[in-house]
Amino acid sequence: MNSDLPATGTVALLELLDPLVPDDFINQVWPHGRTGGRHRAHPAAQLFRVHLLSLLSPVHSLNLLVKLLPEQRAWRTCAGRRRQSRVPDVRMLHEFRARLGVAGLRRINQHLLQPLVEAYAWRQWSVGLIDATDLPAACGGFKKSTGHYSARRAALGGRTLKSGQSRCFVGYKKHTLRLWLHDYTVGVQLVPLVSWVTPANVSEGGLLAPSLHDCQRQWDWCPPLVVADMGYLAAQAKRRCREHWPVAVLTKLRSDMKLVAPYVAWNQAACPQGEPLAWLGYDGRAGEHWFGAPAQPQLCGQCWEAARCPRQFAYRPEPHETLLGRLPLASPMAQRVLQQVRPWIEPAQSYEKHQLGLGSVFLNGLRFTWAMALLADAAVLLRARALLERPIPRPLLSGLMPVQLSLELGADAARSVLPTTNLNPQNHQ
């Protein structure tokens, strides 16, 4: 998440993001009208800005933020409240979250995401990344009287074993499908398309299809290539994504999985006689992958079947969705994406948990956790829009710097995502 923007938590970043907050949209959807009872002292946009301050400022507590607002003029300016005596209290913030709900916060994020999707997503080689991150709950322990943890809807779940962390934790998980803005060449920029928050014991793979369905319903589009980790190995979910939406879900192969023809290794395909095969493309009409011998074969000249061998072989993806899914692992594109794109997800998760402070918030309920997770997505979207609207700096020594972010997917991606490609040479005769 390194960029030319000011550091997160500084007043300079707040001033930069201030004009990008959609105040008119928020006030129009949730108007500041009569309630039939106590009058609302603050418009919806101002309360939304106060919630953003809990992530964009060094104070990651709403209770402490309310107490510090009268002392911080820059924070009050960002929240739209210049008077010290007219700051919202904790009750107002709670009522605002109850009024918007998860659907309302998602609607705001979709409004922020719309120009990014229109500008960057409509490409044949758009790449999405999906993963889950752990959010430990502020839990005092397991209550024997109720049979539940003190944090509402918290559960015992597992996470990737890292130094200084235990294998299990009590809390929640944030599942996010992100889009890589590949036209931004200065650095890697990921924006969240859709996020879910569940108890920690919910499997990651079960939210793959709902995430793509939500993108298709909202934008009439979903990324044709999704990179995931080992938690999304389920063949049934991959088959559903391949059949309902022409989406290739790329994951690595588990070590105990068996190989199927034409694979002799997880990244190498070969004919029955041992000649290495190259992936030629996917025939969307027949639903088959075509593999062929290279231009200069090694074993075809000595093969006893050379006279009748077509040197091109078709395989359907149903026998193994990981090896022969929408995009086979033997293709150079799949290997390049898994090696280069997959590690980008960890810095994005680390930015939300540590710099935005999502991991430091007092998460004592599933509903509150979901609201703060969507607010973190809103902060990332605002930051991405501010970054894309700034002029791209061109260092004087740019020609001497190594290029580390090039990912040429044009030719291979076009062959993999076009469903009408006919790669069978016999059909032209």
Model-inferred region functions:
Residues 57-64, 182-185, 380-392:
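Short helix-capping/linker segments at secondary-structure and domain boundaries
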Residues 255-260:
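Short gly/pro/ser/thr-enriched loop/turn and capping motifs at secondary-structure boundaries
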Residues 333-419, 426-428:
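Basic, amphipathic alpha-helical segments enriched in Lys/Arg and hydrophobic/aromatic residues
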Residues 32-33, 82, 97, 116, ...:
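Nucleic-acid-interacting cores, centered on viral/eukaryotic replication and modification enzymes
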Residues 67, 93, 98-230, 234-246, ...:
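Polybasic low-complexity intrinsically disordered regions
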